[in-house]
Amino acid sequence: ARGSGQLSDIKHVVILMQENRSFDHYFGALPGVRGFSDPAAIQLSTGNSVFYQPTPETAPPTNPTEYTNPDGYLLPFRLNTLTTSAQAIPSTSHAWYYQHTSWDNGAMDGFVTSHLAANGNNGPYTMGYYTQEDIPFHWALAENFTICDHYHCSVLGPTWPNRLYHWSAWIDPEGVAGGPITSNVDPVPYEWMTYPEALTQAGVSWQIYQEVDNYETNLLEMFKSFQNAPAGSTLFQSGMRTFSPGQFEWDAMHDRLPTVSWLIPTSYQSEHPDYTPAAGADFVASKIDAIAANPDVWAKTVFILNYDENDGLFDHVVPPTPPAGTPGEYIQVPGSPNWPIGGGFRVPCIIVSPWTQGGWVASETFDHTSSLRFLELLTGVTIPNITPWRRATFGNLASAFGFAQFPSAVPRLPGTKGQLAQAVYNVNHLPAPTFPGASQTVPVQATGPRPRPRNTTREI
């Protein structure tokens, strides 16, 4: 029965992984989450909190125009999209090396210095953040559904390794099946097992929804088993086919979704800087609207929105990392640094469903393998490759659901078309943001409670 409050009510899981935004960058100012007012924020070796990222006070002779700050630090600063072109900020480095130097073995003091080295005078963008005025649709999702404020990307690195965790929980650290994968480079075809293949073997339906422009983010295309799949096979039909725009919406509205859907954005809709959050919001809204348009589909569907990694954008929470030598969690190929694979920095994750309504926060520690483990819980299909450390460290998303709470009506969300049109205009007509100088202002997090999911009467 609809609203009975149990795992078996869920018939469809839709997962959309967008690109390159950190949690603090989007939601550090959101009330009731672990944001800019975090009482547990760590202290740096300078004696300041982690938000005071060390910055050169004077420019070196070799680069006299390098960004400096007389305060010796740079605080998070608002990217005001109403008065500047800040909907379209440049990307900052999220390469394996610079992600690890930003993390700095857990000291968390390298965000500005690493990105000045990698990106020159665009480096300070690492500390920029948005407010509700700048990304109203994203905030509306958080205010109406459940946001995860301890969700980490899986790898201290870029898109490809993180999306490999998204579909396989693995980057082949010992280099026996085409890896290790620490960068976005065309590989020898990968040969380890993916979760979609495990679903196929178990007879569980799934589909990749992608257009011809998939921004090279469907990493299944890099696997030998998919590259060699016959045109009529499940691996090809579900994993490699491209669709015209609107196919997912049609399938959702006509109750034809598979058990698992993975959505792939186009480049423009991906939210990867310098593409706009507003274009991403319009894309996300179209998917949620299609699910909600059919009450029967809404009543049995979970939509998970997450982000592959943080770009080079600051987040203040120290990611969980394993002890040195943990099997499957360090790159062991000769010549590689003895760095952990992850977890990476926090990224946004919002779960949209009848059982996650109410503006809740889920604070269990998650990463990209958590979505796979939720599918494992739902389907009974075991994830290949996932390490014991990942299973012990990151949850399976179940704690984000409030099955004890009877679902309410689908909330009304703000429109996205007007916001997108305004964003396009502002990007083309307003000046670029300026970076703070001396006498900086500490970022303000809005106040207010945020309830946690209630699962007490009907446990998963």
Model-derived features with residue positions:
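N-terminal pro-sequences and low-complexity stem/linker regions of secreted or lumenal proteins
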Residues: 1-460
